[in-house]
Every structure is written in structure tokens, then in C-alpha cells.
């Protein structure tokens, strides 16, 4: 199947809409799995008689490995999409999400006597889902294809809105479906896999290729010398470092929030689902505000403001921990 590039006019907007829906539906599955995962991992950890500290570390790894794989593979997906087109890579990554979320559902349905296998498959599925989830990089490339440099930042805000919307509705679905997921733990992975399948069908049958034909990528797939030279550019290397630290901080926040609220305030899992949903709602609002704010303020100013708010928010959580547990 040969895809045609988008043309000028309304078609780029349609491409952006499809990318938005694709990212949103895929991240909706991520949002369903995220708050439920500690609850599903803990019985297997208890069956192995793992200490509380070690259990917290293992759950942290299950969370953080997803973001780590996204960070590593996002530029790889982007590079591959430059060579082979956006659509094939988007399809491949969404197919990976379908498979690895289904594998997660199988892992959490295993009996407690197979705790080691279950945890191993959970880890493997999170690694695979993280690699597949790096499709956000391909989505960003699509936005770059369809927008002018002046409007590119506003276009990229669509990814933030899609992420926030998925992060809001996913935990809410988990909240209202908790009783069902307790009886059928495989349902979490199955639902996430089904949602990714819907996104995959959108990518296969609705999305049109946006990479301009004739724009050839470099023959080398990877060049260490070129990578090092690019990273030495302050504008590039500095941004990548900032991005890594921000994502690393947020991933650790995601991994520890549920255990922190349980220890500090005795909050139940379903209460934490609502907390995650509230975080997602804030992400949606922030993404929506970015577009009008980008007209008045520079990208550097907005990035700085966002980082300052992250410092204040995460620092506030650290202060709460210190006050409660000193």
C-alpha cells in the first residue's frame, strides 16, 4: 500500500487530527495501566516474600523502564521515519503497543505460584510498550511535516493535550472499572491493547503519509561522530539534557506517588486513580494554554516557567515527606 503525502489546505489539519486521535487513544491505554500496575504487582512480590523496600524498588523499575525506553527510542523512531516514512513507523509502533499490552494482561493473570515468571513478563511488556510508545517521536515528525516553523510549537502542543487527555480519562476508566479488574486482572492489558488496536486501525486506514517524497534521509542510519557533534551544540545538547531530567523527574514522581500517598495519608488505590486523573486534567489545561501563550511569550520563557513549576511542585512533595516522616 503506497501512501500519498498530504497536500496543502485542509489536509494537513486532517493529518494533525488523526495524529492527535492516534496519540490520545494510545496514551489512554497507558493511563489505564499506570495506576493499576502497583496493585497488580504487589501480590506477586508478596508471594516471593520480597521486602517492602525491595518491592518499592521493583515497582519503580516497572514504571521507569517505560519512560527510559521512550527516551532512548524516540530519536530512533524519528530517524527510521525519515527513511521509510511516517505511516509505516506509526503502524509498527502501534502494533507493538497492541502486542505488549496484551502480554501485560497475560502476565498479571498468572497464578501467584508463578510469581517470578509474572514479574519477568511484566517487566518485558513494559520495556516493549516503552519502545513502542516512542511513536510520540514519529507523531512529532508528522506535526513538523504539516506546520510552518512559526506554528510548529503550537502544533507540538497537541501532543501535550493528547497526553493529558489520555492521562485523565485512563485513570478514570481504571477507577470505575476497578471491581471488574479485580475479578479479571487481564482486563487491564486487554483494554489497553484494544485501544491501541483502534489507534492502529486509524493509522492503517485513515492516516496519510506526510513525508515529502524526494526528501531523502542520510545514507548512514547512525553515526557516532555526527551524534557527538550535534550533542556538543549548546542548543541541542542542552535541550536534550533538560528534556531527560524533566522526564526522569516526572517518571519518578509517577512511580512513587501512589506509595507515598498511601504511607502519608492512608489513601486507597482508587483514591490515587483520581489523583492521576487530576494530574492529567492539569496537563490538558497546560497544553491548551500553550497555544495562546506562545503568541505572547518566547518558547524559552514558557519552558523556563514550566520547569520552575515542576521544581516547586516536586519540591513541595519532598517537603511534605520530610515533615511527615522526620
Roles of regions detected by a PLM:
Residues 2-12, 208-241, 264:
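Juxtamembrane intracellular "pre-TM" segments in multi-pass secondary transporters
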Residues 83-94, 295-308:
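Cytoplasmic membrane-interface "Motif A"-like loop-to-helix N-cap segments
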Residues 72-85, 286-299:
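Helix-to-loop junctions at the C-terminal end of transmembrane segments
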Residues 95-115, 309-326:
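C-terminal ends and interior cores of transmembrane alpha-helices
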Residues 35-56, 255-271:
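Short amphipathic helix-loop junctions that connect adjacent transmembrane helices
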Residues 119, 123-162:
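Cytoplasmic helix-loop-helix junction between adjacent transmembrane helices
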Residues 274-295, 313:
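Transmembrane alpha-helices of Major Facilitator/SLC transporters
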Residues 159-204:
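Helix-loop-helix hairpin linking two adjacent transmembrane segments in secondary transporters
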Amino acid at each position: 500500500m503506497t501512501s500519498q503525502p498530504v497536500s496543502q489546505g485542509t489536509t494537513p489539519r486532517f493529518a494533525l487530527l488523526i495524529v492527535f486521535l492516534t496519540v490520545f487513544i494510545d496514551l489512554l491505554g497507558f493511563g489505564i495501566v499506570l495506576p493499576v500496575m502497583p496493585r497488580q504487582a504487589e501480590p506477586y512480590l508478596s508471594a516471593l516474600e520480597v521486602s517492602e523496600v525491595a518491592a518499592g524498588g521493583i515497582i519503580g523499575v516497572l514504571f521507569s523502564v517505560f519512560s527510559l525506553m521512550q527516551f532512548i527510542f524516540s530519536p530512533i523512531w524519528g530517524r527510521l521515519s525519515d527513511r521509510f516514512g511516517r505511516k509505516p513507523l506509526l503502524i509498527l509502533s502501534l502494533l507493538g503497543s497492541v502486542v505488549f499490552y496484551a502480554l501485560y494482561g497475560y502476565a498479571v493473570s498468572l497464578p501467584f505460584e508463578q510469581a517470578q515468571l509474572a514479574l519477568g513478563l511484566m517487566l518485558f511488556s513494559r520495556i516493549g510498550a516503552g519502545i513502542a510508545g516512542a511513536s510520540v517521536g514519529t507523531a512529532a515528525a508528522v506535526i513538523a511535516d504539516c506546520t510552518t516553523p512559526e506554528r510548529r510549537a503550537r502544533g507540538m502542543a497537541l501532543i501535550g493535550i493528547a497526553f493529558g487527555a489520555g492521562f485523565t480519562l485512563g485513570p478514570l476508566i481504571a477507577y470505575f472499572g476497578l471491581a471488574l479488574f479485580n475479578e479479571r486482572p487481564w482486563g487491564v492489558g486487554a483494554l489497553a491493547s484494544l485501544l491501541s488496536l483502534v489507534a492502529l486501525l486509524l493509522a492503517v486506514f485513515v492516516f496519510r503519509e506526510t513525508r515529502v517524497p524526494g526528501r531523502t534521509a542520510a545514507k548512514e542510519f547512525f553515526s557516532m561522530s555526527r551524534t557527538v557533534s550535534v550533542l556538543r551544540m549548546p542548543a541541542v545538547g542542552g535541550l536534550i539534557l533538560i528534556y531527560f531530567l524533566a522526564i526522569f523527574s516526572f517518571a519518578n514522581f509517577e512511580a512513587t506517588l501512589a506509595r507515598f500517598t498511601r504511607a502519608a495519608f492512608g489513601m486507597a488505590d482508587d483514591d490515587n486513580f483520581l489523583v492521576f486523573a487530576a494530574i492529567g486534567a492539569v496537563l490538558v489545561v497546560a497544553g491548551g494554554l500553550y497555544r495562546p501563550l506562545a503568541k505572547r511569550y518566547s518558547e524559552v520563557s514558557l519552558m523556563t516557567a514550566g520547569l520552575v513549576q515542576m521544581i516547586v511542585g516536586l519540591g513541595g512533595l519532598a517537603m511534605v515527606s520530610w515533615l511527615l516522616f522526620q
